[in-house]
Regions:
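Asp-based, Mg2+/Mn2+-dependent phosphohydrolase catalytic module
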Residues: 6, 17, 22, 26-127
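Catalytic-core regions built around general acid/base machinery
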Residues: 1-11
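Glycine-centered short loops/turns at secondary-structure junctions
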Residues: 11-12, 86
Length: 127
C-alpha cells in the first residue's frame, strides 16, 4: 500500500478523510509509513462522515472545489455521499476487511473508477 500511495502522491495531494481522531491517524501513518499531505475528517468538520460538511471541509482545507477532488474509499456509502456533493469517486476493494469475505469486492453505487487496490487505481490514473 505504501508504494501505491507514493505513486499517487507524485501527482495528487493525499489526505485521509476519517471519522477517527487526528492523533489516531498520525499514529497509523507513522506505524505504516503513510505519507499523507494532511489528515482531514471528523475533527476538522466537527461532524462525521456521510454528513456533507465533512467532505466539503476536506475540499476547503486544500482550497479546492468538490469537483477538483476525489474520494477514494472501500465503502460505497461514503462514495455515494461524496458524489452527491460533486466529488469524483474511486472504489478500492477490501473484500476481507472484517474477516474473510466480509468487505466490498465491488462498489454498490455508481463510481468514476473501481480498482482491486490502490496500485491498480494508480495504474488507471496514469501514475
Amino acid at each position: 500500500m505504501t508504494a501505491a500511495l507514493a505513486r499517487l502522491k507524485r501527482k495528487f495531494w493525499l489526505a485521509p478523510v476519517s471519522n477517527g481522531n487526528i492523533s489516531l491517524m498520525v499514529d497509523l501513518a507513522r506505524r505504516n509509513n503513510f505519507l499523507w499531505d494532511a489528515i482531514l475528517g471528523a475533527e476538522i468538520a466537527h461532524d462525521y462522515k456521510r454528513k456533507p460538511d465533512v467532505y466539503l471541509a476536506s475540499c476547503a482545507a486544500f482550497d479546492l472545489e468538490p469537483e477538483q477532488c476525489m474520494m477514494v474509499a472501500a465503502h460505497s456509502n461514503d462514495l455515494e455521499a461524496a458524489a452527491r456533493l460533486g466529488l469524483r469517486t474511486a472504489h478500492t476493494a477490501r473484500p476481507d476487511e472484517y474477516g474473510p469475505n466480509t468487505g466490498e469486492r465491488a462498489p454498490t453505487v455508481a463510481v468514476d473508477f473501481a480498482a482491486k487496490n490502490l496500485a491498480a487505481l494508480a495504474d488507471t490514473l496514469g501514475v
